[in-house]
Swiss-Prot record:
The keyword Cytoplasm applies. GO terms for cellular component: cytosol. One of its GO terms (molecular function) is DNA binding. SUPFAM superfamilies: YebC-like. This is Probable transcriptional regulatory protein Bcep18194_A5621. Its main location: cytoplasm. Transmembrane segments: none annotated. The keyword Cytoplasm applies. It holds the Pfam family TACO1_YebC_N. It is found in: Cytoplasm. It comes from Burkholderia lata (strain ATCC 17760 / DSM 23089 / LMG 22485 / NCIMB 9086 / R18194 / 383).
């Protein structure tokens, strides 16, 4: 993407994630519980659980923690009955934001999400107000220096839909979200380990923010990310570091 480094953004994202690993573990445990409750405890027949368990491994979560979360989900233990709710809204300058939550109290959650939006210059939207601006996809990002031709051949053979080389030399591979695990397995079997691999809501168009606007937008995103019930925050805003 012209004007900013996707690779730098990913490294920043990973560093921020490492800094709040405990919070990430809490979110992953909730996701594992819900995935196991809805689709069973076998990762081979439950794609959502497989994805959550893979994320837990990437976050260095102990296997015992993962197993306990699966058991709680399958057994319907207290704490496993979370409700999935998506909120949509706008940041400054109309930037689109999607907030995915898992909650046991929707009244509390909607109040906290609305408060974060209003406190930091955004506002809540209605269902569907911004979701159409995003595509639900599997996304992989490979480091600059990765062989573009070899990766493209492996990715397309694995079932990926698109391979893009960014201005900073990193390479992005996109696939249908349902095919994520199969594509990931095929790429890794071919020797290609992504620095970032996730199912995400990818914006169709991005809006760059710099200076004071970037700082304001980052505060809003951080406020939403830090809410206990929030699992994921997606936006078409790109924070450009100057």
């Amino acid at each position: 993407m012209a004007g900013h480094s996707k690779w730098a953004n990913i490294k920043h994202k990973k560093a921020a994630a490492d800094a709040k690993r405990g919070k990430i573990w809490t979110r992953l445990i909730k996701e594992i519980q819900v995935a196991a409750r809805l689709g069973g405890g076998d990762v081979n027949s439950n794609p959502r659980l497989r994805l959550a368990v893979d994320k837990a491994a990437d976050a260095n979560m102990p296997k015992d923690n993962v197993k306990r979360a699966i058991d709680r989900g399958v057994g319907g233990a207290d704490g496993a009955n979370y409700e999935e709710i998506r909120y949509e809204g706008y940041g400054i300058s109309g930037a689109a934001i999607i907030v995915d939550t898992l909650t046991d109290n929707r009244t509390r959650t909607v109040a906290e999400v609305r408060h974060a939006f209003s406190k930091f210059g955004g506002n809540m939207g209605t269902d569907g107000s911004v979701a159409f601006m995003f595509d639900h996809v599997g996304q992989f990002l490979f480091a600059p220096g990765t062989s573009e031709d070899a990766l493209m051949e492996a990715a397309l053979e694995a079932g990926a839909n698109d391979v893009n080389t960014n201005d900073d030399g990193s390479i992005e591979v996109l696939c249908d979200w349902q095919a994520f695990s199969a594509v990931k397995d095929a790429l890794e079997a071919g020797g290609f380990k992504a620095e970032l691999a996730e199912v995400t809501m990818k914006p169709q168009n991005e809006v760059e923010f710099t200076g004071d606007d970037a700082a304001k937008m980052q505060k809003l995103l951080d406020a939403l990310e830090n809410l206990d019930d929030v699992q994921d925050v997606y936006t078409n805003a790109v924070i450009v570091e100057e």
